[in-house]
């Protein structure tokens, strides 16, 4: 079953976890939920400093992004209606809907222009790579690493500079469980909504059941994840009657 990083980790626990990580390089057992602890440990293993930046993080040039979009044209074309649906459901909530490929490369984003400006400051924009190796614990990278939908809220992000975000992501898989990409909803952490995980998970799962091109998909035509997924997106479909609003 999908496993989110919820319930939300208390702020005091997160502060203590950061202190231990910086002072000792390790965390006491039970301080963080297991999925979050695993992601933070992976992030530390990549040599990332929680309070630092990410020098050397890859970012596609305009030409490279154009080639990636062409390479992933079927994924992009079929994801677009889902992204537009999520934008409509979350309008006025200071958020972005993001499509990434199976390596964490951000392909497209739609949503609030004001929030997009803030997101730019932490490279949450098309062309950037949000694999855990470069961004630490984050919904896109952690969903790829765990092969399951995740929520990463506020200070649960490994890098402190991403703490203003609340992000929900779900892998997009083919019928065999192979990850083709990630659908993500990112916004201001003050506007988190309790139904966001169900909405994003349902959107990714629904598209998995109806995209006619997936039987024709092959590894030679799309990027593949660096690790084997633990499972495909599961869960009952959610019928959304009203757009979500920030609290």
What residue ranges belong to the model's regions?
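Intrinsically disordered, low-complexity terminal regulatory regions
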Residues: 1-151, 164, 173-243
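Helix-to-coil/beta transition segments that act as allosteric "coupling" elements at the rims
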Residues: 157-171
